[in-house]
Amino acid sequence: MSKISKGHSTMLAGGLRFATVHELLDFLPAEERALTEELRELVISEAPELKERLSFNVPFYKLHRDVCFLWPASVIWGGRRTYDGVRFALTSGHLVPGCEPYLQRGGRKQVLWRDLTAITPSDERMIRQLLQAAMAVDRERSQGLR
């Protein structure tokens, strides 16, 4: 983990920049770490073809474009914490049929999310279904069908 040098503006948690997902996990409080790991394992097991990368200091998962991300509440964006747990989000949720009302839109046009403090069997089922649908949309978009 490295500190951002002075003079650079950052919206990352406390000016920290994580080099790996494992550094991020080490930074998180125990409950958030466990939930993030559980969601991460769910995404990887359901969609092993997705590539994991860090962006904005949180894990994003990409096929052709970004499909989803996990945003632990302890990784601050905009200067203050606005939810608890971990946010699971589809980056193009507006194109994925059946997302709402499980995922929320808030005031966003494109990204839809759900804030989780635990994963129930119904959450797991919905996340698996939504990941498959989001990957289908991503494949269609990569072929110019959407």
Annotate each predicted stretch with a short phrase:
Residues M1-R146:
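Charge-dense, helix-prone N-terminal extensions
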